[in-house]
């Protein structure tokens, strides 16, 4: 399986500029590549950094091509892998949107240490089952 991630925009003076970082650039790939082993690694925190927000990605692409949801938090200002709840992403709304859209895949926890991941996983489980 190949997982394709929406990235974060780097500052203009950065040495590297990733694509795709917004909805428009993500279309270039998700609309053109039709392969059963090509899935979208939906990075919620990266989506939180663009004007469309992470919900703009879901509004545009839905969940059908998602192979995994990558989860961490940030303030919406710049890329940093905060523990969920330490930034400004609305995780109850995120899980409501993703799960009610029919997503049945897995979530990748990209933050903190093992203890943090277990604690936050337990919190996320309560959000999904409410």
What residue ranges belong to the model's regions?
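Histidine-acidic metal/acid-base catalytic patches
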Residues: 14, 20-130
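Active-site-proximal beta-alpha loop/turn segments in soluble metabolic enzymes
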Residues: 6-17
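Glycine/proline-rich, flexible active-site/cofactor-binding loop segments
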Residues: 1-5
């Amino acid at each position: 399986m190949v997982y394709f991630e929406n990235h974060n925009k780097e500052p203009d003076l950065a040495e590297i500029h990733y694509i795709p970082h917004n909805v428009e650039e993500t279309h270039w790939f998700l609309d053109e590549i039709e392969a059963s082993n090509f899935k979208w690694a939906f990075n919620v925190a990266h989506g939180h950094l663009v004007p469309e927000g992470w919900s703009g990605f879901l509004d545009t692409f839905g969940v059908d091509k998602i192979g995994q949801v990558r989860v961490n938090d940030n303030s919406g200002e710049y890329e940093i892998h905060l523990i969920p709840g330490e930034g400004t992403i609305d995780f109850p709304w995120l899980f409501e949107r993703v799960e009610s859209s029919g997503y049945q895949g897995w979530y990748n926890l990209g933050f903190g240490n093992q203890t943090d991941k277990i604690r936050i996983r337990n919190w996320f489980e309560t959000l999904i089952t409410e």
